[in-house]
Amino acid sequence: MTSQDSLTSIGAARIAVTALLDGGVRHVVVAPGSRSAPMAYALAEAEAAGRVRLHVRIDERDAGFTALGLALSTEAPVAVVTTSGTAVGNLLPAVMEANHSAVPVVVISADRPEELHGTGANQTTIQLDLFGDHVRFAVDVPAGDHPQKAVATALYAATGALEDTPPGPVQVNLAFRDPLVPADGDALPAAAGHGVFHYDAGPQALNLPAASGELAERRTVVLAGHDAGPVAEAFARAHGLPLLAEPSSNARFGRNAVGPYRVLLAHFGPDSPTPIERVVLFGRATLSRPVASLLARESVVSAIYQPVPVAWYEEGRRRETPIETLPELADFAGRGSAEWLDSWLLAGAAAQHGLDGVLAGEDLANGPSVGATVWEHSRGQLVLGSSNGIRDVDLAGQPHPEPIATVYANRGLAGIDGTIATATGIALGSGRETTVLLGDVTFLHDAGGLLLGHGEPVPDLRIVVLNDSGGAIFSLLEHGAVEDSGAYGTAVERLFGTPHSVGIGALAAAYGVGHQTVSTTAELAAALKSPLKGRTIVEVRVDRSGLRALHARIKEAVSAAVGQVLTAG
């Protein structure tokens, strides 16, 4: 392209915006910056015309996670626009999560023109391939070049249209020369109102034909990991098999679902009268060591249902046999006998009874009781933060008869960063009431996610913070035993517990977000049932000093209750 043919920066930006919209983008998150100004102006024009919804964030890390949440709830590509320099690097955590979760986040990174690189020019660095293998596609568009093909190809890759490639993040690095503002005489078009950019599928259940009586009877369990979907529940029901479903599987419901399954696995171990023979895995199981141990048992044959490529799986790296079709999976799984399913359901009911009995004896709220209460009262959309929150729900949340909420979690890399921003994006993308459960450390890590500028869309978002003044999860791992031994003094508490005394109420007030404090599950249940408009924080103050002992009592009570049932059977 000759200099006479080169596009102005605003002209190139308008073409890029048109290509984004043509590719299905309806939400764009914009972080302020001068080099990205052409994109900002072009997007403002598109928003005024009612063609796109913009979300402005001053923190690029939160911009990235907001885009991630929007893409999760709308099931469509979402773009995030930044200026040059470190602004682009702040997107890395969200891009990493999007990669491992196969979420189509489109990074539009503005850049200095080629002649400024290597000169020491301000905010100028190598931005192409900054995200390495975490993006499906990355391309440089030099200043003045036509960006349509680059943007279209990026969207093609982001949405999983490339052969044998799952959806995921992409990067389009657009260089812009001065002038970075519209030409004299340009102006926003007359406001045409906003289009409807919400996507609301809601929780779903599926039906599959009952398993053929010719299938062999096998002691198979259906394990539904993250993002398994309702097909896992339908398969378990059709084959008469126990369903062991993580909360973010969106399959933790129905008559075959077993609640506290992870504390039951030892009762159906290799030395039991009725050991598990086979496992059918839907989605990705990430939450507990008992499940990891089950999948590693030499005596257990396992398969993973994988109809399309997934981002986290490399062939030959796992023990499970990948199976692409449900008929093949049916042949592998067989069907469960009535005795096999009943033994699991009876054991599950006994375990739930034992667990509930321990929790009922506690005067104040604790992690498992908060998880159970949030799960019981979930509706609309539920976002579960990493660390203990999602595991508390997995342990104590009793499966519902039918799906009542769509559940999300950042389980791609299971980091605690960006959880508030992700939940905000999820709520804005659907327009539905959303509750997020997270710990105080996760909350503080993304406190900036509470910041919404004047005039920005405000979601209906309830933020439940389990505040135990630090990181309780480490006390349930090997580090808890090290602390109990006293061999390292206070080092374990300092390095892993990370105690603090932040006033969450004061922090909420600073951001203009409502706040209330509760200390019992009854108070929490009342807060969860209250009508929700806008954003509010429900802080549940708990003491983590006795958490390790509480889990020991739960394990003992469950073991006794289940032992009685299985012995009687």
Swiss-Prot record:
Tell me its EC number(s), please. Answer: 2.2.1.9
Which SUPFAM superfamilies has this protein been placed in? Answer: Thiamin diphosphate-binding fold (THDP-binding) (SSF52518)
**Any keyword Lyase?**
no
Its needed co-factors are: Mg(2+); Mn(2+); thiamine diphosphate
- Please name the pathway: Quinol/quinone metabolism; 1,4-dihydroxy-2-naphthoate biosynthesis; 1,4-dihydroxy-2-naphthoate from chorismate: step 2/7; Quinol/quinone metabolism; menaquinone biosynthesis
Query: Which terms are listed as keywords in the entry?
Result: Magnesium, Manganese, Menaquinone biosynthesis, Metal-binding, Thiamine pyrophosphate, Transferase
What InterPro entries does the record tag this protein with?
MenaQ_synth_MenD, THDP-binding, Thiamin_PyroP_enz_TPP-bd_dom, TPP_enzyme_TPP-bd
The molecular function GO annotations come to: 2-succinyl-5-enolpyruvyl-6-hydroxy-3-cyclohexene-1-carboxylic-acid synthase activity; magnesium ion binding; manganese ion binding; thiamine pyrophosphate binding
The note on cofactor binding and number reads:
Binds 1 thiamine pyrophosphate per subunit.
Under the heading Pfam families, the entry gives: TPP_enzyme_C, TPP_enzyme_N
Q: Which Gene3D superfamilies match?
A: 3.40.50.970, TPP-binding domain
Question: Which reaction is catalysed here?
Answer: isochorismate + 2-oxoglutarate + H(+) = 5-enolpyruvoyl-6-hydroxy-2-succinyl-cyclohex-3-ene-1-carboxylate + CO2
A single BP term in Gene Ontology: menaquinone biosynthetic process
CDD domains documented for this protein? TPP_PYR_MenD (cd07037), TPP_SHCHC_synthase (cd02009)
Subunit description? Homodimer.
- Family, per the entry? Belongs to the TPP enzyme family. MenD subfamily.
**Biological role stated in the UniProt entry:** Catalyzes the thiamine diphosphate-dependent decarboxylation of 2-oxoglutarate and the subsequent addition of the resulting succinic semialdehyde-thiamine pyrophosphate anion to isochorismate to yield 2-succinyl-5-enolpyruvyl-6-hydroxy-3-cyclohexene-1-carboxylate (SEPHCHC).
Query: What is the official name of this protein in its record?
Result: 2-succinyl-5-enolpyruvyl-6-hydroxy-3-cyclohexene-1-carboxylate synthase
Organism the protein comes from: Paenarthrobacter aurescens (strain TC1)
State which gene encodes it.
menD
